Amino acid sequence: MRLHGRARRAAVLTGAALLVTGVLAGCDSPSSARPDQAGPGQPDWKRCAAPEGGTEPGDAWRCTTVDVPLDYAKPDGDTIGIALIRKEATRKSERIGSMLFNFGGPGGSGVDILPRAAGSYQKLNTRYDLVGFDPRGVAGSSGVRCRDDKEQEEALRGIDMTPDTPAEEAAFVEDGADFGAGCARLSGTVLPHVGTTNAARDMDAIRRALGDRKLSYFGISYGTELGGTYAHLFPENVGRVVLDAVVDPTADTVGHARNQATGFQRALENYLKDRGQDPEAGTRRIAEMLRRIDGDPLPTSSGRRLNETLALTGIVTPLYSRSSWPQLTQALDEAENSGTGDGLLQLADSYNGRDENGHYDTQSHSQRAISCADTRARPTAAEARALVPGFRELSPVFGPFLAWDTAGWCARWPVEGEHDTPEASAPGAAPILVIGTTGDPATPYEGAQRMADELGEGVGVMLTNEGEGHGSYGGSGCVTSLVDAYFLDGKVPADGRTCS
């Protein structure tokens, strides 16, 4: 279970807005013009069906599928359908074009998430069609499946993700191999083709199908890696692009894990200080609690037991958003003082995509498939074990888990990965707004700085949000007003601007 952003929050968060000053984002606006090259045919928009486990999004939304090559090296071969959802601009006479969204994961379904998050983007929707999509290998776009609910439940209950004995380590390694074998068995046709580079090519096909001369795009979390890859492949087609909660494009598998150990420890310490607790003492207390749970899982009212992995997941979940910190306080109090795991288990279930009936969504399947298609790294259990002491120094709570995760993720994966780190240089592209939040646990602030540098001088425009949480639009009035002015008026903030 790799730490990620599930992008489930759809509420509007408000803050103080600041006046915007800046230069225009070039002479071109990303208006809907004739496609610049041949591509998919005109989309046939129809009423949307309810997503798995969800409800119909409503009459304002329409859905379609755009067919693209399964293998871009064989453009005349088999195709894969990319699922789209759209809500048209409310001021049609002032329409700028389409705005494509990716909310992260990888593995998040834009078709599912965008209607629930659309309230946060009402101002942008006045002049843009809001468009979400399921990247290849996700949900409605030939979503990857690797195991059933029973197998998923047994793995979360029975596999120790921080193994302490040879037997636990052997089971940990075998579970990773079994998961990959399940993906190959159930989704073998699509599995070699679900990487981020292909998803970026799909985005350009979507742009052409929508009739937009330039791509307007809002990428969050993993969506920033996808956006950086798109800018590298198609710099001439970049319109107005915002990358918020940025994945470090210079980090490899171990580097990402190290970044997250640092980021989540920083967020935990900020949480503890906010609660009037000493960060070092609080960290030691939580680490000791996890050690006890590893040996003796906590009971819950459902009859399920809260093991160390689920407890850690329950702690991780509310650190993504400061507004969820009270839930963490209550859940920790239950676990530490009442000896019950209900609160942490509920948070873990939300993170893991488990509903009250025991059904799991498949975001974690898609996430793993996409990540392992991207990265060539295949660390062994022995290599992960050697990382544990150093990672524990970075974070006594999260470090050991993240060290072991480097091996549990893609070892013995049935498909080779594409690269060590993604390419994001985009010479000649229009200015891209890159937003980093200083207290972001999942994609630490430094990754945004590196993305801005990688995009190149005059392309990456750095905006700092001094705050907590994973993602800043809607949570910071300053950031929100700057992003709105950029998308709606083409005003590019000064590089290095800070929102406090």
Model-assigned labels for residue ranges:
Residues 276-371:
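Alpha/beta-hydrolase-fold enzymes
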Residues 4, 14, 21, 25, ...:
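Feature targets compositionally biased, intrinsically disordered low-complexity regions
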Residues 1-30, 66, 203:
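Secretory targeting and sorting signals
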Residues 4, 8-9, 14, 324, ...:
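Generic alpha-helix initiation/capping and coil-helix boundary signal
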Residues 29-310, 369-371, 375-500:
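Gly/Pro-rich cap/lid or specificity-loop segments adjacent to the active site
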